[in-house]
Amino acid sequence: MNWRSERIWIELITGSRKTSNLCWACILFLGSLGFLLVGTSSYLGRNLISLFPSQQILFFPQGIVMSFYGIAGLFISSYLWCTILWNVGSGYDRFDRKEGIVCIFRWGFPGRNRRIFFRFLMRDIRSIRMEVKEGIYPRRVLSIEIRSQGSIPLTRTDENFTPREIEQKAAELAYFLRVPIEVFRTKEWILSRHGVGNPRILFNTTDLSSEQLLIRSKHVSVRSYFRSLLFPVCG
């Protein structure tokens, strides 16, 4: 969800309060509770759950193992419920071209870093950085490169963006900020042997108009760019 005008761009970031997280927290809690009750039933010799008679399950080793899995699962589900309750990772990104200020806010865990807030000048932005990891578990992360501060991620690592979605978002943001886009390509076998890949500027948005940028973002694919390893496409 975002609101955008000619000079201001505000994007609301969804945190841990997602439907998928709620489903996983419920499933994990119920499953862990069932394992723990079965293990306790085998120890007490009483049928706390009618579906699993305690006489058919020995406390050693089946009951101990199921109790351990149940306790571990309850800890993990408690962690998930806490992140949902505190809405960790939610916040907003505000780009004000009129005042030349960028504000990035995120909610964290309770404590010193409960409120994570970054504020810097728009002229300090070097580029929009797009990291694409290919392999069995692909990852696409969009971040903003700041002088003397490094890169600040704008998207979560667990967000499943398609190549077209991440390209479109990077192109629109780069055009709004008038900065170039840097693409970092990594593969699993390259990462293990040679580290991360070198950045390549896909195209410079400062030299393109709005119509040209939309046309360029539709035709330039990150996948084809990585396959062919071409030089940066210039306007």
From Swiss-Prot:
Family, as annotated: Belongs to the Ycf4 family.
Gene source species: Amborella trichopoda
Pfam families named among the record's database cross-references: Ycf4 (PF02392)
Superkingdom to which the source organism belongs: Eukaryota
InterPro entries: PSI_Ycf4_assembly
Predominant localisation class: plastid
Entry's Gene Ontology cellular component terms: chloroplast thylakoid membrane; photosystem I
Protein's membrane topology: Multi-pass membrane protein
Keywords tagged on the record: Chloroplast, Membrane, Photosynthesis, Plastid, Thylakoid, Transmembrane, Transmembrane helix
Protein name: Photosystem I assembly protein Ycf4
Sequence intervals crossing the membrane: 21-43, 63-85
Compartments where located: Plastid, Chloroplast thylakoid membrane
